[in-house]
Amino acid sequence: MITPTSFEPVELLYSKKKVNRTNWKKNVLKSNPEINNLCERIYPINRAIQFGKQFHPGKAEVKQKLDKTAIIQLILQHLSTKGLKQTKQTLEKEARTTTPIVEGLNESRLVTYIRNALKDTDRIYDLSMEHTEYSKEERQSKITEREELLFQMDLLEDEDEDDGVNIWDEPTENIITEKVHTTEYDINKSKENKDDQDDEVVKFASLNKLVEHLTHDSKHDLQFLKTFLMTYQSFCTPEKLMSKLQQRYNCPSGHDEMATRNIQIRVINVLKGWVDNYYSDFDDKLIAMLRTFIDQIQIKFPAPASAVNKSLTKMVEKLSPVNDSKHIFNEKTPEPMVPKNIFSNNLSIYDIDEEEIARQLTLIEFEIYRNIKPPELLNQSWNKTKLKSRAPNVLKMIDRFNSVSMWVATMIIQTTKVKARARMMTRFIKIADHLKNLNNYNSLMAIIAGLNFSSVYRLKYTREELSAQTMRTYSDLEKIMNSEGSFKTYRTRLQNVPPMLPYLGVHLTDLTFIDENPNNFVTDVGGKQVSLINFTKRTLVFKIISLIQETQVVPYNLQPVHQIQEFLLNIRSDLKAHTLDQYQQELYRESLKREPKKAQRSDVL
């Protein structure tokens, strides 16, 4: 043990020494990294204690507010909002209690409480993640994984200003329309209203007002219905829409009898249209809510309720994994050009006919493309970390595009002799030409992108070996996919008769441009700032997604060849460890070996 008397001489002796004490903390941590490591480890604990004191009310307070009965009633109310009647009744019987009825409350209180808790927890979680041994990429990956899971559980949905307002109590000012004059039946007119007149088009509105317009007692806007059902998930969940339709159906007492009947019929028609055209929106939870709603409708409208029930039955069949309806073609399927060595383990690009490669590339990509659902194309889901789980097929298409582009560049760069490289380049140009003939603009653009990688584009002597005919073909293909005039030539070709596989990148760019424009219109209602949904934007989104839907329904009359598809699906097996940028850099280094800078033709093999 060191006593004060023994310590003083040491301090005195140390003080007389000339020691540089500037940056002492930095120097100590540098020479003793274990101290720094310890500080990093305990930092989140210290911070968590402070946050815990702020956000944790203590066991006694929690117990007073959340006893066993309160928790059971929260669960019962949650089951009620989700339409799970049988489960709710069983729990009521077992717990010997009833579900609390709260007027005007359609949101699950349990979910609301969990969301609020998560908001507070996020502060501790993010702070803790910031001070761990995870790399930046690992940390982001874990945060993304957590957020995607919570989004799938509907626990991180944005709050909706309409949540606490019953549709029948919504202020009349919360909708802004515009008169549009039309002289003939067009997309803004229903068949009921095709006389020369002014149409009222919704520009901005609250969710309640949008649903009210959707189910108006006297006006039937067919185009509005189509646009709404395709785009509603950009501002509302399916469960919320179902809840709002139920609110709208339950007209207040004293409401005009004829208007009430018309509104209720409109609600039923919306339900049927929703089920018939957007069955993929319905998970088990939403189906349970719909069945409960149908039971209510059955009392007053047995025939319409039966029609919705039939649609629901068909929908369940469509959602079944065993359902795989086949398209019947009028023309005979062309015979595939199968190489003699089709079963060889060493099958190469030179063994397969260029046209057959184009066919199989088209079948592979169209299978992904046809599965893209409208919600995947909303709110830039493919671009945003929190929403990527909602756009699996769009992300597959993007990944496939990158795979084909890198495959093209890799096959050319890996070919060591200049004449052989030119032969490989020629082969890809021929494949691209066949893709053009198949109206497969996505794979066509992927090959053009690969040929335009800087590592390939710089191969001057390789290009000089291409024939004049090949160069003309390549020039024509580039003109089709030229970005000039916002891809004017390509957009003109979209008028061709399907089957067709559009270049998805153009349409994702269009959707991004629309999404990044001002989202909502903020207006002053009764001295209160209210944010209204920009429905004009949804109309533009509808037009783009409609084009995609039109080309999804007409498949290619081609015969799949399993072995060739396996070959084309494995083209990127050795690239998985690289990002696109890393791989392009690696290819560029290889390209410099093939044709060094300032090299003469005689220097290149």
UniProtKB/Swiss-Prot annotation:
GO terms for biological process: aggregation involved in sorocarp development; chemotaxis to cAMP; MAPK cascade; negative regulation of asexual reproduction; positive regulation of gene expression; positive regulation of phosphatidylinositol 3-kinase/protein kinase B signal transduction; positive regulation of Ras protein signal transduction; Ras protein signal transduction. It is found in: Cell membrane. Residues 353-597 form the Ras-GEF domain. The lineage of its organism: Eukaryota, Amoebozoa, Evosea, Eumycetozoa, Dictyostelia. PROSITE patterns: LISH, RASGEF_CAT, RASGEF_NTER. Disruption phenotype: Grows at a normal rate, but are severely impaired in both chemotaxis and activation of adenylyl cyclase, both of which are critical for the early stages of development. Unable to aggregate. Residues 198-320 form the N-terminal Ras-GEF domain. One of its GO terms (molecular function) is guanyl-nucleotide exchange factor activity. This is Ras guanine nucleotide exchange factor A. The keyword Ribonucleoprotein does not apply. Ras-bound GDP/GTP exchange factor required for normal activation of adenylyl cyclase. Component of the Sca1 complex, a regulator of cell motility, chemotaxis and signal relay. The Sca1 complex is recruited to the plasma membrane in a chemoattractant- and F-actin-dependent manner and is enriched at the leading edge of chemotaxing cells where it regulates F-actin dynamics and signal relay by controlling the activation of rasC and the downstream target of rapamycin complex 2 (TORC2)-Akt/protein kinase B (PKB) pathway. One of its GO terms (cellular component) is plasma membrane. It comes from Dictyostelium discoideum (Social amoeba). Keywords: Cell membrane, Guanine-nucleotide releasing factor, Membrane. Residues 67-99 form the LisH domain. Component of the Sca1 complex composed of at least gefA, gefH, scaA, phr, and the protein phosphatase 2A subunits pppA and pho2B. Interacts directly with gefH. Disulfide bonds: none annotated.
